[in-house]
């Protein structure tokens, strides 16, 4: 399929090329980096509290983190989402509405990561539910 997509894209009309979207909510480093960067630029100093509180949530140690620690990260991630929401006007003015939407979704992905990883026996069900939400988000915010 990938080869077919590459071949198709070589001759596809402008704007009709095929691509993939993705945002991995089972890992956190990329989402943290993006949302912290945008938040810090929009509201200097605002990201530091969350960088510290969510430092445990890193891709290198993901399999060594306890379910209890993930559960404790969920309220912090909820607060981060609220912080991004509170900075919406500043982020939109500085970077645009799509940057705000993506930063907010990165914050949600951090929450989802904690939720999925703390779920143990319900891992697949929780993950699949969040994946369905992510598909809906991309349908709303993507280019096709």
Regions found by a protein language model. Give the residues of each.
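Structured catalytic-domain cores with a bias toward divalent-metal coordination
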Residues: 1-144
């Amino acid at each position: 399929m990938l080869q077919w997509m590459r071949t198709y894209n070589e001759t596809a009309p402008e704007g009709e090329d095929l691509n993939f979207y993705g945002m991995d909510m089972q890992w956190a480093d990329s989402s943290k980096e993006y949302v912290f960067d945008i938040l810090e630029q929009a509201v200097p100093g605002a990201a530091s509290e969350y960088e510290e509180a969510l430092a445990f949530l890193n891709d290198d140690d993901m399999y060594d983190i306890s379910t209890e620690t993930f559960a404790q990260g969920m309220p912090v991630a909820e607060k981060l989402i609220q912080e991004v929401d509170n900075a919406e006007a500043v982020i939109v003015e500085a970077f645009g509405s799509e940057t705000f939407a993506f930063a907010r979704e990165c914050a949600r992905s951090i929450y989802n990561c904690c939720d999925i990883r703390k779920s143990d026996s319900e891992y697949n069900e929780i993950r699949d539910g969040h994946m369905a939400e992510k598909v809906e988000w991309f349908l709303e915010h993507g280019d096709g």
